[in-house]
Amino acid sequence: MRRIGRTLRDRAVQRRLGAAVLSGVLLALAFPAFDFGLLALVALVPLIWAWRDASAWRAALYGFVFGVVFAGILLYWLWYFGLVAIVPLVAGWGAYTALTGYLVGCLNRAGLRSPWLIAAAWVVPEALRARWPFGGLPWGDLGVALHDFPPARALASWGGVALVSFVIVVVNAYLVDLGVAFAMQTRRAMVVATAGIVVVVAVVAVADGARYQTRPSGQLRLATLQGNDQDRYLTTEEKRSGYLAERHFALAERLHGPYDVIVFPESSLDEFSPESNPGLRSRLVAVGRAHGADVLANAAVPAPDGREFNQNLLYTPEGRLAGTYSKEHLVPFGEYVPFRSAVDWTGIVDRIPYDYTPGTQRTIFRVKGHRLATVICFESAFGPLVRDFVARGAEVVVVSTNNRSYRRSANSEQHIAQTQMRAAETGRPFVQASISGISAVIDTDGHVRDTTKLFHQAVVSDTVTTTTGETPYVRFGEWVVVASALLLLGAAAASRVRRPPATFPKLPAADREPVGSGRIT
């Protein structure tokens, strides 16, 4: 403990901790609701400066502080679920950025300070966080900050969000090298850093200009119903009377003309299932028959294990159940409670009295000769899942979601940003259907159109052009993550053979790490 206190009292360490906090704040400002996306290109400069010359353990400390600050701001809407949700998720986020810091510290010790290696050390833990624990949490991946920047979306079509994250880190790292070289008046280092930035800009320009164009395969006319206008939890009486279902059926009466698909989003039928309620099923089919449309509805449907699926169901105008898709990636502390028995003393167990069962089959629906995939709620944040649907032949993707629990927070805007990147990665049109907003149509390049406001009843009616063909990301998958892992392994092997000479000057003496083992425990 004395060593920890001595370390934290050191002025150089304090400056670096302050830099980590600053980076966390700046990066949070790059995401919705602030959405200063291009700020991400400089937001990591303080953090990477803090990592420069740092030991592995101290770099891990700086990474942890950065991650906690960033995630604490980005995921502030988790407060709706209490401390039992936000504390472990934010701390877990910090653990992954601590791992990035540790890897960078190991590279420092080996004399390897390349921006490309720092980017690899970022991408690999980011990919791990998207997969483990509890199925992963890709929300807030670095590359998503540039969701409204067309060249970044073009990059995503080549290598997914991971490639965008990689490029952002490289740019930030070269800016640090350039700044230090300028401060130390080291001409060679300035030339190398400037050349690196020029190379990155050139690569992005080429990727943007040579973007793979998916092929139009037809058109589908869709309508999504956004019926919830209550910015609060519904009363017991409202739930019993089917408040949400009635609001959505009332919106359906406003539809005119033929449609191919009409979407009743996640939770729009309250707690009723059309498979166990013939009257409800008849009403859904009647809506479809009136417009010659298939109806995509969502309901809680009994599962074989006695629990329930969160399930999308597709009904034809003739009344046939054409197929179902059960949500695969359930929301921790939202649709199930990890370690339920250990946290049964908290209020969250009262709000989530039972756990859903995850689905196991990825269904491609057939609609008017086209192949349509659906994902439910935050599943649109999982690039590999959506990629697999497209690889199986999906020509359009519908995101059925219920974000009402997050009220008027930035969650819904962040959700749209995730879906933009999925559209850009796959070259498919997306329709985001939400019971309370934000609903939207997103083009194959990730451009958003026809958006709605939160908690306003609305109908999004549009014709989308379905597409076929595989972008490089769909064809080759997470090749950036694999390449980053191999790059780190190669660096580890090279460091055992010889210690390469430092390319860039060290920081001024006042900013260097204090002499010692560098351990904080």
Segments predicted by a language model, with ranges:
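Membrane-embedded alpha-helical bundles of multi-pass enzymes
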Residues: 2-212, 407-408, 419-422, 434-442, ...
